[in-house]
Design a protein with these regions (language model features):
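Residue-level "edge-of-site" marker
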Residues: 14-15, 61
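Short secondary-structure transition/capping segments
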Residues: 22-25, 68-70
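Short, flexible active-site-proximal loops enriched in glycine and acidic residues
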Residues: 8-14
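Short, conserved phosphate-binding/catalytic loop or strand-edge motifs used
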Residues: 15-23
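Active-site capping/gating regions of soluble enzymes
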Residues: 31-173
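Intrinsically disordered, low-complexity linker/loop segments enriched in Gly/Pro
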Residues: 11, 26-29
Length: 173
């Protein structure tokens, strides 16, 4: 009961690969989001095993098919209401090379890049889903940047910590 109340999935749909599904969760603070990601994978694995199945969160379970990503949506605002998203995006772009080893922890993680809608270059776009960072047209509480390179095998705790630190890099101002 409580797990499902905290998780708050907003939508889900079948993705491009066989048996591949995307589940989007309601935004939350980084610690809650990391807890939810870990709990979600544990619940899915448990339900799959109970039903004689296996859930696969690996980045590239089937060669020649789309891989699995763990897109991270980031939104932030300063206490005084000043715009901070450009700085956060600049920090992530500046530090992504060093962070990638933690966001993509296995060799197969890199087989995913550049295929289907997985990013190939350090770039951003307002709508192109094949870019590293996508900035959806959403406004208000849903205004965000979406980092598309992490895969489901990364530690969400470490990933969120690295992204926050990169976004707060004041040397880029």
């Amino acid at each position: 009961g409580d797990v499902y109340k905290r998780q708050r999935p907003e939508c889900s749909h079948h993705e491009q690969g066989p048996g591949q599904n995307e589940i989007d969760f309601r935004y939350s603070d980084p610690l809650t989001a990391a807890d939810n990601a870990v709990t979600f994978k544990a619940v899915v694995n448990s339900v799959a095993v109970r039903n004689g199945l296996a859930a696969d969160f690996s980045p590239k379970p089937l060669m020649g098919q789309p891989g699995n990503g763990m897109h991270i949506n980031i939104s932030a605002k300063s206490r005084d209401g000043a715009e901070v998203m450009p700085q956060i995006i600049a920090g992530i772009l500046a530090h992504i090379a060093e962070m990638t080893v933690f966001l993509n922890t296995r060799e197969e993680s890199y087989h995913r890049f550049g295929s289907s809608k997985a990013p190939r270059y350090i770039s951003w776009s307002s709508e192109n889903r094949s870019q590293l960072i996508r900035i959806p047209a959403a406004q208000g509480e849903y205004r965000r940047a979406e980092l598309r390179s992490p895969d489901p095998l990364c530690s969400p705790y470490l990933a969120f910590t690295l992204l926050i630190r990169a976004g707060l890099d004041l040397s880029l101002i």
